[in-house]
Amino acid sequence: MDFFSATTFGFMAPKGFTKNPESLDSLRRMFAGTGSDTLLLPVAALQDHAYSTKIDWTTDDVMSEEDVRACVAVARELGKKVILKAMVNCRDGYWRAYINFFDTYVPCEPQWEDWFKSYTDFNVYLARIAQDVGAELYCAGCEMVGTDRKADLWRGLIAEVRKVYSGLVTYNCDKYQEHNVTWWDCLDVISSSGYYPINDLDNQFARIHAVAEKFQKPFLFMECGCPCRQGSEFIPNDWTHGGDLDIDVQTRWYRAFLEALDENPWIQGVGWWDWSANLYPADKAMENSGYGVYAKPAEKLLLDWNRKHGRA
């Protein structure tokens, strides 16, 4: 498997967002600024709450097939690879990791089978597009910790994806969960979210390496990044952390993570989080405390790193 140097683009972008020329300009700027060789495009469907069994990807709040194709067209025009990623968010704001149902059947209560039927339908829809556009990798889900134990249902979902998509298939488990997923064997690639503390990268990488060795699968970080807030280098996964603005925090974390990647050549890809379709002004970058790297020092670190490895 070739190394994927990806950046996530357009998370939670609505239907029709690519009709705004500035959105696709942002995508081009992403490739130019970071040197990434892969577009990682997340299509985030919606369900009402963590106990809902109906998933909606047709709403105006979710990017359309037309949007997906427009983004892929830009990537191909620039000679880039493509990862399509299925996600689901809860409309009430609860994190998708809390999606969960009773393991024992209870009349009148929501059922695992109903949720997986809806989520499988969504995946088949997106996997068909992935096949048609020739995506190099398809990711069937993201950080769905509450669902991870339902191995048989996940195996069924992956089997349906493979009926319509012939490329590599993965699942993006949450940080610290790599060893808890028992069904990596039905996938081609193990992937996870790499929001690990700056002072614990060696330990976490070694732990993950053991999982990859056990299953004899390639591994990549489907997500990783760090906000620009004091303390975020130790809890980069916490998007709600209220530390004071500190651009250097992100810079230090990225430098450490890039060095760790170079020291662990068994890792075969990374997906940086994230790049917005609606960018903040460049002259306001040093006032932005979020995960974005646009016009921040971390952007230059990524570009230099990708150039060093001949990807930019």
Where are these regions (language model features)?
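The substrate-binding groove and active-site-proximal loops of carbohydrate-active enzymes
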Residues: G10-F17, S52-E65, Y105-T120, G141-D148, ...
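Substrate-binding cleft and catalytic face of glycoside hydrolase catalytic domains
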Residues: T34-T53, E66-T147, S276-N278
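Short, acidic/polar
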Residues: G16-A32, F116-I129, D174-W183, T251-A260
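Distinct, well-ordered alpha-helical segments
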Residues: N20, W95-R96, R149-I158, C173-V189
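Aromatic-rich peripheral "rim/lid" segments of glycoside hydrolase catalytic domains that contact
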Residues: T18, N264-A312
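Active-site neighborhood of glycoside hydrolase catalytic domains
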Residues: D121-F122, L137, M144-N172
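Aromatic- and glycine-enriched glycan-recognition loops and surfaces
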Residues: G16-G33, D56-E77
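Glycoside hydrolase catalytic-domain groove-lining segments
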Residues: M63-E65, A70-C71, E77-K81, K85, ...
